[in-house]
C-alpha cells in the first residue's frame, strides 16, 4: 500500500540529490569550492541521520548506521576546507606585509596535494550504491513520522546541544572548547532552519536567533586564526633555523588568538546567561 512521504524526507531528498551531484564531480577533479559545498551538504545529511536516531528510540545507533559510509569522506573534505582557510590567511599576510613566504607556500602545496589525493581516492573508491542505500534507508526511517514527532525530536536535539555547551564551556575556554562551541551553534542553526522549512515556529525569538548566528559568525576569524597558527607552527617545527619574518608572524598570530579568544569568551557566556535563565 502506498504511504505518504514525510515532509522532512522531501528536504533530505533535495539535499541528498545535490550532494550526490557534487560527489560525482569530485570523482573527476577535486576542487576546493566543490569540496566545501559537498562538506556542507554532508553536514545536513548527518544531522538528518541524527534526527532519525532521536525519533527511533528502539534503535539508538540508527543515525550512525545511516551516515557511517560517509564519515571518512566528510573528514577528508573538512581537511580541504581547513587548508583553504589557511591559504586565505597566507594570502592576507602577504598582501598586508608586502613580504613573500615562498617556503611556507610550497609546504602548503604539498599538504594540499596530499589532502586532495585522499579525497579523490575516497570518491573514486566509493560505489554510488552507498548513496542509493542511504536514500532508501532514510525513506524507510522517515515513513509514517508525524509532524509533532519531528518537532519534538528537533527541540530535543537543540536542547541537548545547549546543555552540552553549558556543561562543557568553562572559563578559560580552550581551543577544543571553541571548536565544540562552533559545532554546536552550527547544528542549532541548521535545526532551527529545518523547523522553519517544515512550517513550525522557531524555538528562539528573532533576537536570540540573531545572537546565535552572530556568535557563530564571530567564531570564524578565531577558527581561521587557530588553523593558521597550528599549521604554521607545524611548518616551523621542521626548521633548524627560523627567519625573522616567520617569528614575527607566529607571534602576531598568537597575540591575535589571545585577543579573539577573550572577546568570544565574553560573548559566549553572555549568550549562555540569556538562553539558560
Task: Annotate each language-model stretch with its function.
Residues 1-277:
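Function-determining surface determinants
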Amino acid at each position: 500500500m502506498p504511504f505518504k512521504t514525510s515532509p522532512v524526507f522531501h528536504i533530505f531528498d533535495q539535499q541528498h540529490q545535490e550532494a550526490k551531484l557534487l560527489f560525482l564531480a569530485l570523482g573527476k577533479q577535486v576542487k576546493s569550492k566543490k569540496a566545501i559545498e559537498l562538506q556542507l551538504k554532508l553536514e545536513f545529511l548527518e544531522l538528518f541521520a541524527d534526527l532519525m536516531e532521536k525519533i527511533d528510540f528502539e534503535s539508538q545507533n540508527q543515525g550512525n548506521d545511516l551516515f557511517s559510509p560517509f564519515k571518512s569522506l566528510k573528514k577528508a573534505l573538512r581537511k580541504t576546507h581547513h587548508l583553504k582557510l589557511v591559504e586565505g590567511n597566507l594570502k592576507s599576510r602577504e598582501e598586508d606585509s608586502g613580504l613573500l613566504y615562498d617556503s611556507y607556500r610550497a609546504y602548503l602545496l604539498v599538504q594540499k596535494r596530499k589532502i586532495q589525493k585522499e579525497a579523490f581516492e575516497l570518491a573514486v573508491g566509493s560505489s554510488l550504491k552507498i548513496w542509493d542505500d542511504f536514500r532508501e534507508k532514510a525513506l524507510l526511517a522517515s515513513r509514517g513520522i508525524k509532524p509533532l514527532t519531528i518537532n519534538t525530536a528537533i527541540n530535543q536535539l537543540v536542547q541537548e546541544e545547549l546543555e552540552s555547551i553549558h556543561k562543557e564551556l568553562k572559563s578559560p575556554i580552550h581551543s577544543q572548547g571553541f571548536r565544540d562551541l562552533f559545532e554546536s551553534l552550527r547544528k542549532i542553526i541548521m535545526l532551527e532552519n529545518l523547523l522553519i522549512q517544515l512550517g513550525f515556529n522557531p524555538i528562539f525569538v528573532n533576537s536570540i536567533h540573531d545572537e546565535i548566528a552572530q556568535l557563530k559568525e564571530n567564531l570564524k576569524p578565531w577558527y581561521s586564526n587557530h588553523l593558521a597558527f597550528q599549521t604554521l607552527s607545524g611548518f616551523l617545527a621542521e626548521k633548524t633555523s627560523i627567519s625573522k619574518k616567520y617569528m614575527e608572524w607566529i607571534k602576531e598570530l598568537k597575540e591575535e588568538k589571545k585577543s579573539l579568544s577573550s572577546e568570544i569568551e565574553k560573548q559566549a557566556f553572555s549568550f549562555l546567561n540569556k538562553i539558560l535563565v
